[in-house]
Design a protein with these regions (language model features):
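TPR/TPR-like (Sel1-like) alpha-helical repeat modules
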Residues: 109-130
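C-terminal motif of bacterial Sec signal peptides marking the signal peptidase cleavage site
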Residues: 13-16
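N-terminal hydrophobic targeting signals that begin at the initiator methionine
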Residues: 1-2, 18
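N-terminal alpha-helical interaction modules that lie
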Residues: 18-77, 85-105, 111-113, 144
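Sec-dependent signal peptide recognition
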Residues: 2-10
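Boundary/linker segments of alpha-helical solenoid repeat arrays
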Residues: 69, 129-140
Length: 145
């Protein structure tokens, strides 16, 4: 009985050492997250379909954050905001998004909606990660002028 106590204690200690992720980057497939796959594809291919899919992934990551901190991963709000503040993105989304992709937004005026949402995302990035203010504040100023 005395020889089992160290084994049981060791098992308990080792089982409590599991790590939990601070941020959720999307489901993985072979170690590559869905976000990484879509981001790589949309920035390299620049196809309307891949950009529409990326917008949906960003929106999900921002509105339903997972992980122990329950906030979007660092840089996601800024990337999403930058994409939305691009004037071509709203037009591209209006023309090429599927019905289910469009249903995540309550408006059909994507130009105005994306501009507001883009600025909001940049502000969220600074709120979640204050150290990013040095970079994000001038970027907001430049993009919204």
């Amino acid at each position: 009985m005395k020889s089992l106590i160290p084994v049981i204690v060791s098992c308990m200690v080792l089982s409590s050492c599991g790590t939990t992720a601070l941020y959720y980057w999307g489901g993985t497939s072979n170690g590559v997250t869905k976000y990484e796959q879509l981001a790589y594809k949309s920035y390299n291919d620049q196809t309307p379909e891949s950009i529409c899919k990326l917008i949906v992934v960003y929106e999900d990551m921002v509105t339903h954050p997972k992980g122990t901190r329950n906030v979007p991963p660092p840089g996601i709000c800024a990337e999403y905001g930058y994409l939305l503040l691009n004037p071509d993105t709203a037009e591209l989304f209006a023309k090429h998004a599927t019905f289910s992709q469009r249903s995540i937004f309550d408006s059909s005026d994507y130009r105005q909606l994306f501009r507001q949402r883009g600025e909001e995302m940049m502000e969220k990035e600074m709120a979640f990660y204050p150290e990013s203010t040095t970079f994000i504040a001038p970027l907001i100023k430049r993009l919204t002028e």
